[in-house]
């Protein structure tokens, strides 16, 4: 699942990261929550 960094929906996060609950940004914590 593609999740997005910041509020720019054109910038996907690195491969392997999952979509976060807000669907507006992602990071390591977001990845853990998505798994």
From Swiss-Prot:
Tissue-level expression: Expressed by the venom gland.
Record's keyword terms, sorted: Acetylcholine receptor inhibiting toxin, Disulfide bond, Ion channel impairing toxin, Neurotoxin, Postsynaptic neurotoxin, Secreted, Toxin
Disulfide bonds: 3-20, 26-30
Principal subcellular localization: secreted
Compartment list: Secreted
Molecular function via GO: acetylcholine receptor inhibitor activity; ion channel regulator activity; toxin activity
Cellular component, GO, one term: extracellular region
Domain of life (superkingdom): Eukaryota
Similarity comment text for this entry: Belongs to the three-finger toxin family. Long-chain subfamily. Type II alpha-neurotoxin sub-subfamily.
Free-text function comment from the UniProt entry: Binds to muscular nicotinic acetylcholine receptor (nAChR) and inhibits acetylcholine from binding to the receptor, thereby potently impairing neuromuscular transmission. Pseudo-irreversibly inhibits the nAChR through competitive antagonism. In contrast to other long-chain alpha-neurotoxins, lacks affinity for neuronal alpha-7 nicotinic acetylcholine receptor.
Name assigned to this protein: Alpha-elapitoxin-Aa2a
